[in-house]
C-alpha cells in the first residue's frame, strides 16, 4: 500500500509473519507520529537503520513499550539502501499512528548546531584562558501552550549528550514532574541518555532499584501547585533561588559550565513579560527560542532591546502537535507519581510503607495567593484527615528544630512521600516512602498535589 505524499515506490506499511505485527518503513526525514492512550501499551522495536524519539536514539532489535503519550519516531538518516524501519504491535484500535514528511526536525537540528557551536567556542576559550572562564549558552524556550516546548527541550538535551556536552536541564513548568513530582521546579545535569519509556519521557531519579539508565540527581525546589498563577510570588521566588543554585553549579563544574543551560517553561505570552524577564535575569539567559509565535518574538525583541548580548530567535512548531486536555494531563501526572514510587514494567522499585507520629514532625502548607496577605510564605498546617489523606508531602533539607516557615523558602527538597491515610484519633500518618529506612525528622511541606494509590 502506498501512502499519499510519499510516492508509490515503496511499501510503507506491510504485514509481517508474526500475528498482529505491522512493519513500518519510515522514509528519511519523516516522522512516525503516535498517540497512545493511557492504559494502552504500544510495543515496537527498530529492526534496521536509525530512529530516534526527540533526539534519543532507539536501540536496534530491542522491544520498547510506551503508554499514555503523544510522540513521534523520527528517521534522520539512511544506512546504505535500507529504509529506517520499526516493527510495532498494534494491540488496540485506540492507538493513532501515521507517517508524515511534514517535519520541522531540520530546523531543530540547525538550532542544536548553533547552540553546540556556542558551547565549542566557550570550551576552547576556557582551555586557552583558564583564568578568564566563560559560560556556555543559556537557552530559554518560550511559547504558548501545546507549542512543543518540552519536546524541544528533550531534543536539545539529547543532542547535547550525543555531542559529549553536559548541559543543565531546568524545568520551570510545575505541571510536569521532571526527575521529580508535579509541583516542583528542578535543575538536573544531563550526562546520559533519556528514558523514552518512562511516564513523561525523561527518566528516573536516584531511587530504590537498579536502573537501565544512569539515575539523574536534580536540585528540587518546592512550589506545591501545578499552575504558576496559584501563587505567582512564590513561583518567582523559587525560580530565583533555583537560578542562584544553577549559576553556582556552573561556577564549580567546568563540564556544566561549558554545556550551559536549557530551560523549559510553562505557557508564557507577552502578558507574562515580568516572569520571562525574571527568568532571563535569574539564569543569565543569552538565547531565547520562541516556538511558533512571531508576534511574541517581535515583542520580546522590543522589550529586550537594551540587552545587546541576548539573542532572540523563532523556530516553527511541529504540525504534528496534538492538543492535550486537562484529563490527559492529570492522568500523566498520576502516572509519573506512581512511577516515582513503584517504577514501571522494566524497573521495579521497592517503596516502603510506615506509620509516623504527627507530633514528631513539623508540617507546613503551601498557600494560595488569595488566602493570605503575603503569598511569599508557608504557613503551619493543622494535620487532619481532610487535608492530608491522599496527598503528597515534601521532605525538606531543614531539620525539625527549625521553626520558621520563612526558612522553608530557601531550602531544597530531599524527596516526596505519599500520605494514604491520617488517623485523627491516634495522630498517626500512614506514608509511602520511595526508599526503605527511617523517616527523616525534617520539616515537611503539605503540597496541593493529590494522588490515590
From Swiss-Prot:
Highest taxon in the source lineage: Eukaryota
SUPFAM superfamilies, per this entry? P-loop containing nucleoside triphosphate hydrolases
Q: Does the keyword Membrane apply?
A: no
Annotated residues that bind ATP are located at: 31, 70, 146-151
GO molecular-function terms, A-Z: ATP binding; polynucleotide 5'-hydroxyl-kinase activity
Record keywords, A-Z: ATP-binding, mRNA processing, Nucleotide-binding, Nucleus
Any one Gene Ontology cellular component term annotated for this protein: mRNA cleavage factor complex
Family note: Belongs to the Clp1 family. Clp1 subfamily.
What compartments host this protein?
Nucleus
Q: Which cysteines are joined by disulfide bonds?
A: none
Any Gene Ontology biological process:
tRNA splicing, via endonucleolytic cleavage and ligation
What is the recorded name of this protein?
mRNA cleavage and polyadenylation factor CLP1
The main location class comes to nucleus
User: How does the annotation summarize its subunit structure?
Assistant: Component of a pre-mRNA cleavage factor complex. Interacts directly with PCF11.
InterPro entries given for it? Clp1, Clp1/Grc3, Clp1_C, Clp1_C_sf, Clp1_N, Clp1_N_sf, CLP1_P, P-loop_NTPase
* Main function: Required for endonucleolytic cleavage during polyadenylation-dependent pre-mRNA 3'-end formation.
Checking Gene3D superfamilies in the record gives: Clp1, DNA binding domain, P-loop containing nucleotide triphosphate hydrolases, Pre-mRNA cleavage complex subunit Clp1, C-terminal domain
